[in-house]
């Protein structure tokens, strides 16, 4: 029976949670473990994660600025290209207009030369016609005089 109160006392002392020297030792071990984990593991990991976040942030910023620059350059090149096309079309139109005016001028000159040649040919033909008519008139006069003399001489012979 004497033994029973000791057993009851041990049961009461050895319960689920005792407030003796092991509790502060466990708390101290826990704090030392947390301190070691913080210095050995968490700080380098958070530093690496922070560096990675910073790298991603700067890379995204750089990429977005490069994308904006690329868009600006593309817009500028499109504008320059459309301006060059307009200039080229204007030059082509001006060249076509100049060529058309040169062709029209050449056609007018050719027509004027042709008209001049036709006029000169017509004048020459009229002159030749006049000369031919004059020659024919002279020949007709001569022939009629000859016929007349022959007729008169043949009548005088009869």
Swiss-Prot record:
One of the Pfam families matching this protein, by short name: ATP-synt_B
InterPro entries referenced in this protein's UniProt entry, alphabetically: ATP_synth_b (IPR034679), ATP_synth_b/b'su_bac/chlpt (IPR002146), ATP_synthase_B_chain (IPR050059)
TM helices/strands, residue ranges: 21-41
Lineage: superkingdom: Eukaryota
Matches recorded under CDD domains: ATP-synt_Fo_b
GO annotations of cellular component type: chloroplast thylakoid membrane; proton-transporting ATP synthase complex
Alphabetized UniProt keyword annotations: ATP synthesis, ATP-binding, CF(0), Chloroplast, Hydrogen ion transport, Ion transport, Membrane, Nucleotide-binding, Plastid, Thylakoid, Transmembrane, Transmembrane helix, Transport
GO terms, molecular function: ATP binding; proton-transporting ATP synthase activity, rotational mechanism; proton-transporting ATPase activity, rotational mechanism
Topological type in the membrane: Single-pass membrane protein
Cellular compartment(s): Plastid, Chloroplast thylakoid membrane
Function: F(1)F(0) ATP synthase produces ATP from ADP in the presence of a proton or sodium gradient. F-type ATPases consist of two structural domains, F(1) containing the extramembraneous catalytic core and F(0) containing the membrane proton channel, linked together by a central stalk and a peripheral stalk. During catalysis, ATP synthesis in the catalytic domain of F(1) is coupled via a rotary mechanism of the central stalk subunits to proton translocation.
Subunit structure, interactors included: F-type ATPases have 2 components, F(1) - the catalytic core - and F(0) - the membrane proton channel. F(1) has five subunits: alpha(3), beta(3), gamma(1), delta(1), epsilon(1). F(0) has four main subunits: a(1), b(1), b'(1) and c(10-14). The alpha and beta chains form an alternating ring which encloses part of the gamma chain. F(1) is attached to F(0) by a central stalk formed by the gamma and epsilon chains, while a peripheral stalk is formed by the delta, b and b' chains.
Miscellaneous notes: In plastids the F-type ATPase is also known as CF(1)CF(0).
UniProt similarity note: Belongs to the ATPase B chain family.
Name this polypeptide is given: ATP synthase subunit b', chloroplastic
Source organism (scientific name): Porphyra purpurea
Lineage, uppermost ranks: Eukaryota, Rhodophyta, Bangiophyceae, Bangiales, Bangiaceae
């Amino acid at each position: 029976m004497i033994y029973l109160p000791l057993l009851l006392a041990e049961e009461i002392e050895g319960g689920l949670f005792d407030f003796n020297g092991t509790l502060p030792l466990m708390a101290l071990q826990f704090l030392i473990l947390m301190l070691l984990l913080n210095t050995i593991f968490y700080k380098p990991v958070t530093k690496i994660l922070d560096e990675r976040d910073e790298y991603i942030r700067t890379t995204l910023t750089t990429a977005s600025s490069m994308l904006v620059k690329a868009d600006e350059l593309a817009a500028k090149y499109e504008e320059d290209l459309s301006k060059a096309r307009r200039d080229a079309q204007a030059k082509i139109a001006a060249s076509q207009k100049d060529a058309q005016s040169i062709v029209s001028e050449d056609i007018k000159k050719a027509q004027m030369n042709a008209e001049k040649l036709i006029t000169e040919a017509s004048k020459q033909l009229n002159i030749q016609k006049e000369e031919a008519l004059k020659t024919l008139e002279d020949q007709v006069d001569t022939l009629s005089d000859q016929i007349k003399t022959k007729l008169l001489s043949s009548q005088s012979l009869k």
